[in-house]
Every structure is written in structure tokens, then in C-alpha cells.
Design a protein with these regions (language model features):
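Short secondary-structure boundary/hinge segments and terminal tails
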Residues: 55, 110-111
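Short, solvent-exposed loop/turn segments at secondary-structure junctions
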Residues: 106-108
Length: 123
């Protein structure tokens, strides 16, 4: 079962053709998906990709609600970080201080700027 879940996640996250889509009532599969996604800190990304690929209607409603709740919370938290980063950016620029952002701070302002909810940050 875990092999199927891992294959599903790889295909989902890397925009590959999904060769196996579990039945909506396959509770064991969906529970394992949550466990693996949680352990890899990718639950918001899983929600985002399911939504992006139009697959949310094919998963259990309680799972959809759970994934959305985590995605939404993460998006709000990341937006708060972006606001703080922008404030720091302005202060440093106003004082002619050379700087650059690293890690999550950089990623939020560049790579993830149009979808800030997909990556969990811990900086």
C-alpha cells in the first residue's frame, strides 16, 4: 500500500500521468497518504497539486477539508512572513545596507511568490 501511495505522490507532485487513482472509499490509502505527506511536510503541496489538477472532487470530503485547512493556515502564515520580509527589505534598503535573503525568505519572494501556501517554512 505504501508503495502505491508513494508512486501516487510522485506522479501528483511532478505532474506525471497518474497511473493509479484510489477509490474515494479506500480509507487505508488516504490515511497512508496523510501519514507520508505529513512526515515529509508536504501536505499543503499535496492540496495545491490536487486542486491544480482538478482532482479534489475524487478524494473524500473530510480529507479535502483537512488538506484545505492546513494549506490555508500555511498560506496565512507564509503571507505574514512575506510581510515581515518586505518590511526588513525596506528598512535595509532605506539605510543603504547591502543584503540578500537566504533559504525560505528568498524562496517566498521569488519561487513561491504566486503560490505562497504550498511550502511549509520554519525559518
Amino acid at each position: 500500500m505504501n508503495t502505491q501511495v508513494k508512486l501516487f505522490l510522485i506522479q501528483l507532485l511532478f505532474d506525471k500521468k497518474i497511473t493509479f487513482f484510489p477509490d474515494i472509499n479506500n480509507q487505508k490509502f488516504w490515511n497512508n497518504l496523510v501519514k507520508i505527506s505529513s512526515s515529509q511536510i508536504i501536505i499543503p503541496t499535496v492540496y495545491f497539486k490536487l486542486n491544480e489538477r482538478g482532482l479534489l472532487k475524487k478524494i473524500p470530503n473530510d480529507l479535502k477539508d483537512y488538506l484545505f485547512e492546513i494549506y490555508s493556515f500555511n498560506k496565512k502564515r507564509n503571507q505574514s512572513m512575506v510581510n515581515e520580509i518586505n518590511s526588513i527589505h525596506k528598512i535595509l534598503n532605506d539605510n543603504n545596507i547591502n543584503f540578500f535573503f537566504l533559504k525560505g525568505s528568498y524562496l517566498l519572494r521569488t519561487i513561491y511568490k504566486n503560490s505562497i501556501g504550498i511550502r511549509m517554512m520554519h525559518e
